[in-house]
Structures are given as structure tokens and as C-alpha cells.
């Protein structure tokens, strides 16, 4: 049983394909039709959900058309939105362990078929896969997390230079927007107020694509920041021995660093896709990160 969210042109195409694939039933969910978002309970046995609405699309990231927990038999989710790479719907599927797919592959396949029609010749099917992977690499953000002073800003700048990307720094952005240093903002307003500012900035930076993003050491203490960074990014945890972390100009590092690390360690582990040893040279760190990134074909 398949549910198709939305009743526009893309919905008609998806319904045609599902029927061609002999889905047992295909139901269109719209805002005002007989089957709508107010009576989704009647479709709790849905096994496939396809979102054809723009809900969750850039720049309005972070919202989802439905709560997947309403569908205990769900076996697959497709969201035709391709920006961000992982919509809120897709990320919930990921969290629940439900197989999912975003809309980028569909976009590339559609472009391939369009090119064939206009150019009058066939294009190898393998080109769809190649271009899909290439676009995925180019659009993906590379995000750096880690303790204060672990080298995130330095590594981000060098990595961006090596990959011909733009480096963004959440702390620098906070300071530019507020006309004050992060240290003074924390001392003046307290850590909780600073974290709220930080989450706003991270939400903005995370919506962008193809960037290298250095984050503040404490951003992992707010779970909402994970979705902002994960939606378009691969996240690297830069690890550096505590005795090598600088403290000057960092009010939150002035106390017990070991206690801070113990408190945050599980958060770093939760956020990170990869863990990188940053006790050596910047070049060694760059090599580790580059080795973890998908290779070009």
C-alpha cells in the first residue's frame, strides 16, 4: 500500500509509476480531498510513502508533511525534494531505520531522459549513477566539530582551499552578526543565550551546500544543531589531546577541561560520521579527511 503526499503534476507521475509497478493500492493525500492530512489514521497500514509536496524544501528546511511514527508497517520513504539532501522527513526515516531516498536521483534521471529527447540519441544508463554521485559530492557540506581549540577553523580554511570551496565559521558569523566576540557574548549574556544565537547561525549555515563549515565547540550540546548540520553534511569530529587545547580567550575552557570533555563526549560521538585524530600536522589531518570523502569515479 502506497501513500502519495500531494496532488500536483509530480504526484500524477509518481502514481503512474506505482501503478505500473503494481502497487496493491495507491492513495493520494491532499489538503482538502477525501483522503487528507486530518484522517491519516485510516492509512496507518501504509508500506510506502512518497512526498511530492515542497514541504521541507530549501529554504524552509526542518519541517515534515507527516510524522512517520503513524505508520508502523512502513518499509520505504521517497522524498522528491533534493535540497536539502536530507529533508526532515528523510531524517526521521533514517532515525527509525526505514529505507529512504531523496529526490536527487530522480532529478538526474529526469534530466537524462529530457536530454535524450532533445538531442535525439540515447545516453548510457550508467551516466545517471555517475552524475548523481558527482552532484552529491559537490553539494555535500563538510562539517567540523570538536572541543574548543581543537583546530576546526584552521583545518576548515586549509580544507576549503584544497577543495576549492568556501569556508564558513559559525563563531565568526556570530561575532559579525552581533558586533562582539563570542567570549564577551558568553560573559555578558550567559551560555544559554549564546547557544540560542549559535543555533540560529548553524541553521542558516547548514541550509547551504558545498561548504566547509567549522562549528563552535559546544554546538553539540543542542540536539537541534544535529539536524541543521546533518541535512546537507558529512560531519567530522576533530580530536585533540586535552593538554594540547588552548584556553586563552575561551571562558568556557577556563575551568575543568576534562569535565567538559566528559560531558560532551557522547554528543560528539552522536553527531560524528567520522572521527579524526588532529594531534599531528594540518596536512596529516587533511589527508585523513580526504581519505574519508567519497572518491571521484
Where are these regions (language model features)?
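Adenosine-phosphate binding glycine-rich loop
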Residues: 80-140
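Conserved lysine of the Walker
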Residues: 152
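Rossmann-like adenosine-cofactor binding region
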Residues: 35-100, 219-225
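NTP-dependent small-molecule kinase module
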Residues: 129-137, 142, 158, 162, ...
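A glycine- and Lys/Arg-enriched "phosphate-lid" helix/loop adjacent to the NTP-binding pocket
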Residues: 231-267, 274
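NAD(P)-binding Rossmann-fold cofactor-contacting core
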Residues: 20-37, 171-178
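ATP-dependent small-molecule kinase phosphotransfer cores
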Residues: 169-230, 262
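Glycine-rich adenosine-cofactor-binding loop
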Residues: 1-19, 146-148
Amino acid at each position: 500500500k502506497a501513500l502519495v503526499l500531494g496532488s500536483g503534476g509530480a504526484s500524477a507521475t509518481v502514481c503512474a509509476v506505482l501503478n505500473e509497478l503494481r502497487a496493491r493500492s495507491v492513495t493520494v493525500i491532499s489538503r482538502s480531498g477525501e483522503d487528507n492530512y486530518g484522517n491519516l489514521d485510516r492509512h496507518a497500514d501504509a508500506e510506502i510513502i512518497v512526498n511530492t509536496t515542497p514541504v521541507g524544501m530549501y529554504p524552509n528546511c526542518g519541517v515534515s508533511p507527516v510524522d512517520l511514527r503513524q505508520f508502523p508497517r512502513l518499509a520505504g520513504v521517497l522524498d522528491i525534494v533534493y535540497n536539502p539532501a536530507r529533508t526532515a522527513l528523510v531524517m526521521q526515516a533514517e532515525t527509525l531505520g526505514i529505507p529512504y531516498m531523496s529526490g536527487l536521483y530522480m532529478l538526474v534521471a529526469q534530466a537524462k531522459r529530457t536530454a535524450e529527447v532533445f538531442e535525439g540519441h540515447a545516453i548510457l544508463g550508467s551516466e545517471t549513477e555517475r552524475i548523481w554521485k558527482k552532484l552529491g559530492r559537490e553539494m555535500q557540506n563538510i562539517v567540523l566539530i570538536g572541543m574548543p581549540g581543537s583546530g576546526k577553523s584552521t583545518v576548515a580554511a586549509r580544507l576549503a582551499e584544497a577543495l576549492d570551496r568556501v569556508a564558513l565559521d559559525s563563531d565568526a558569523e556570530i561575532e559579525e552578526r552581533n558586533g562582539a566576540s563570542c567570549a564577551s557574548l558568553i560573559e555578558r549574556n550567559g551560555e544559554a543565550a549564546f547557544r540560542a544565537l549559535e543555533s540560529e547561525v548553524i541553521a542558516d549555515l547548514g541550509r547551504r551546500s558545498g561548504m566547509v563549515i567549522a562549528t563552535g565547540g559546544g554546538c553539540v550540546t543542542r540536539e537541534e544543531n544535529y539536524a541543521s548540520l546533518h541535512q546537507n553534511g558529512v560531519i567530522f569530529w576533530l580530536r585533540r589531546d586535552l593538554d594540547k587545547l588552548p584556553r586563552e580567550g575561551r571562558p568556557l575552557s577556563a575551568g575543568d577541561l576534562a569535565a567538559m570533555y566528559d560531558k560532551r563526549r557522547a554528543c560528539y560521538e552522536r553527531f560524528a560520521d567520522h572521527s579524526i585524530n588532529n594531534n599531528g600536522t594540518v596536512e596529516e589531518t587533511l589527508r585523513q579527511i580526504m581519505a574519508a570523502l567519497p572518491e571521484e569515479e
